[in-house]
Design a protein with these regions (language model features):
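Alpha-helical solenoid repeat scaffolds of the TPR/TPR-like class and their adjacent stem/linker regions
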Residues: 1-388, 393-462
Length: 462
């Protein structure tokens, strides 16, 4: 840009606004912010610049100023449907649900065909457990735009949580988690064709827990006659997954994998759909993962010698969208478990929270093994020597279930994961293995832990 053009732009709010949008689209957020703020200095009532500055700040996590920008923009121009939507999304993240509902409703009053607003309102209603209304919103969005993948994906979670698997798995195919890997594949995606004598590459998806839960489908592919099955997985799962029946080769995703070879590829989480899984036909042959005997022998001497041995996991991955609700805020919430006679505790906490295992009481006395684990094969070997695992919703709970190790799962009331269904105290994914302890109200872990303590006391007395 010539110097003269720069001067003209710097004095023109509309040109600054356009430059800000261009910078925002290319990820140059600092330049975008400077453009929007300069535009507003020149034209304080520039509603669109105020709204876009709010969006930029919102994406950066500065929600206080972002909300102020949104509300200022709407005061200047109340007919900005997109800004009502953005404000609703911000309020939803802050759990200010009535205000969020009002914002989305206003967006739809302005534009009844606003598919994103219908979908977001559906998400909000699902959070509020108004599931009939949530479903109506998702279906309205899809009626307006049958190709709107976000609404279809959101609908899948609602249907799966309700056990309506036929349509739920079909809608779940709207996800795009595997898209970057899929773009590298040269062979066709498997759509249920005959696998006799064929090779297939299974792509990893989601987190460690997703991989462990849905790894159960690998033997089903072998039963269909697949000659060779290669499983791509997270590095920390590689050794553990070598014990998975049907997996001929296990490759961590940080290593090269044969994208150009094989007859078919498939994302792991598409296997329930292609296998026609229903609530009464979940592959549930437990265990389907196994501890390594040498590792068991190595970890066994480190376990408590006396009493019932119980493993504890009180935090999941901090990267999970619902971590603030599904993880315990502190290990100290489990302090009452330390007074149950005849029980010894082992920390299986790895990463976030593992430092708490070294704290003195009021936390229950722990043998800290989590900080020493290298991968999930180590965790499996430790669990082999335990009598029970008590865990928040985490990959470790899935590991216990897949190993056939009794596990008590502590679940939040807010955004309870779809896979634990509604109101059940058991799981058809891990029959006879998992017992679910659910919050009755959002954030109330004290009641859940009191129930766990009473159950643990009864078990220890046996």
């Amino acid at each position: 840009m010539l110097d003269k053009e720069k001067v003209l732009t710097a004095a023109d709010p509309e040109l600054l606004f356009r430059d800000g949008n261009r910078h925002l689209e290319t990820g140059e957020v600092h330049q975008a912010e400077a453009c929007f703020r300069q535009a507003l200095r020149l034209a304080p009532d520039f509603a669109s610049a105020c709204a876009n500055l709010g969006y930029l700040l919102d994406q950066r996590g500065e929600q206080g100023e972002a909300e102020a920008c949104y509300r200022r923009a709407l005061a200047l121009d109340p007919l900005q449907a997109q800004t009502h939507l953005n404000l609703g999304a911000l309020l939803t993240c802050q759990k200010r649900f009535p205000a969020a509902e009002a914002a989305y409703s206003q967006a739809l009053l302005i534009d009844p065909h606003f598919t994103a607003a219908w979908s977001n309102l559906g998400v909000l209603y699902a959070y509020m457990k108004r599931e009939d209304q949530a479903e109506q919103c998702y279906r309205q969005a899809l009626e307006l735009d049958p190709d709107y993948a976000k609404a279809r994906f959101n609908l899948s979670y609602l249907l799966l949580r309700q056990g309506r698997f036929d349509e739920g798995w079909a809608c779940f195919e709207a996800r795009d988690w595997h898209a970057p890997l899929a773009a590298r594949m040269t062979c066709p995606r498997w759509q249920g064709e005959d696998l006799a004598g064929k090779s297939i590459l299974i792509l990893y998806e989601g987190g460690h827990g997703d991989m462990i839960q849905f790894g159960r489908y690998v033997p089903a592919l072998k039963a269909r006659g697949a000659a060779s099955i290669t499983l791509l997985c997270h590095p920390a799962l590689k050794v553990l997954f070598t014990t998975l029946d049907g997996a001929d080769e296990v490759i961590p995703f940080d290593q090269a994998f044969p994208a150009e070879k094989g007859d078919y590829w498939i994302p792991l989480l598409s296997l329930p759909h292609l296998n026609g899984t229903r609530l009464d036909s979940i592959p549930a042959a437990i265990p389907y993962l196994h501890p390594d005997a040498e590792r068991v022998a190595r970890w066994s001497p480190l376990l408590p010698r006396e009493g019932m041995r119980v493993g504890l996991i009180w935090k999941g991955s901090p990267l999970h969208e619902n971590d603030a609700d599904r993880s315990l805020p502190t290990l100290d919430l489990l302090s009452s478990l330390g007074t149950v006679p005849g029980v010894s505790y082992v920390s299986l906490q790895k990463g976030t929270g593992e430092d708490e295992a070294k704290r003195p009481p009021p936390a229950p006395p722990l043998v800290d093994l989590g900080s020493k684990m290298e991968d999930f094969a180590d965790a499996a070997a430790i669990m082999a020597g335990l009598d029970l695992v008590i865990s928040v919703d985490s990959a470790m709970a899935h590991l216990a279930g897949a190993l056939g190790k009794p596990c008590w799962l502590l679940l939040p009331d807010f955004k309870t994961d779809w896979r634990w269904l509604k109101e059940r105290t058991d799981s058809p994914w891990y029959p006879g293995t998992l017992r679910l302890f659910r919050q009755k109200t959002r954030g109330d872990w004290a009641t859940v832990i009191a129930e766990v303590r009473a159950a643990l006391e009864g078990l220890a007395q046996q």
